[in-house]
């Protein structure tokens, strides 16, 4: 009889405790004292002596407990995080080599600096910006063995500005993104100026170049003083943490550049529409590739802007889902596998967001690498016009000499540094926007 009474009391106690737990979902998160050293998986126990200091270096405590969120965050599953990081490795590596090839091609290492135009300088800055941003975000060839440790130095700790690797990669990433964005906008304006045949002085172009780089430096190093660089929940690299800094130092400039790009595209299309069919055909043949690239990158920038705006507006919703999952973990601490996290950020949308910048490396290769102009730059370079080539590959050398002789006898001169290629008197010697030999389209 006594044993039955004890069983009944134990059963009643269990039911009573469960009732308390379910009647106050935030009970554990907001004040429950857990047994020392205990946190239900995948949460991590942090034995802290200075809670605020631990928060400052990247630990994300759950309520008043000593449990911290795992790193990477619970927004995605570990498998989904691996997919995004592996994508950054594969797509980033391909784009990296593509961009290195293009930068070498259009740099003084291969391309004669006398042939430089506004457009040449613009695309070099664009290529360099994309390369810098892409090689400092996500997973790279040289840190495969680090896994998540690059951005999660300790279990449950998100890297912060105090971690030197995080600070360096964040600065380069921000610098690369802003550089690529501002010069993309500049190229879109330059394309319209070229079609309108507006003359831009070399001095004005140099002033603009200096101003753009000063703005880039300010937007990059401004947040350092407020210790704003770090690894956050939905990112795959260190970047700006607080919303107001993200908006002020990046997304506001993005919005401005998108407006500039959109206006430029409308003006370009208007100019092409207003000319005769014969001139229109020539303009399209000459400018179609850069125009397509500008529009394609505009689409990607707009997608990234919309995705960021949407996820930011749903931030509280995502927080509530994570909180419900954490409460479930505490309630079912003995069997946490029964807890399933609800839908937060769309894995596919998040995947494509980070893929966009890596696609840009492949896109510029398609529009600027696989062209006649790229081949001409290499064939005219020192690398194909030296004693070794003349000795062992005389056919290539004689072909280059013949083309050079024809250009000289034709009386052509190279366009000035401040001019874009289509404004110069020499379409073959300067960098074509479209990579198409302009002389073949002259009436």
From Swiss-Prot:
GO CC, alphabetical: membrane
Induction (free text): Down-regulated by P.aeruginosa, PAO1 strain and PA14 strain infection.
Keywords annotated in UniProt: Glycoprotein, Membrane, Receptor, Signal, Transmembrane, Transmembrane helix
Compartments where found: Membrane
Compositional bias annotation for Low complexity: 397-410, 419-432
Membrane topology: Multi-pass membrane protein
Signal peptide, first to last residue: 1-23
UniProt-recorded name of the protein: Frizzled/smoothened-like sans CRD protein E
Organism annotation: Dictyostelium discoideum
Gene this protein is translated from: fscE
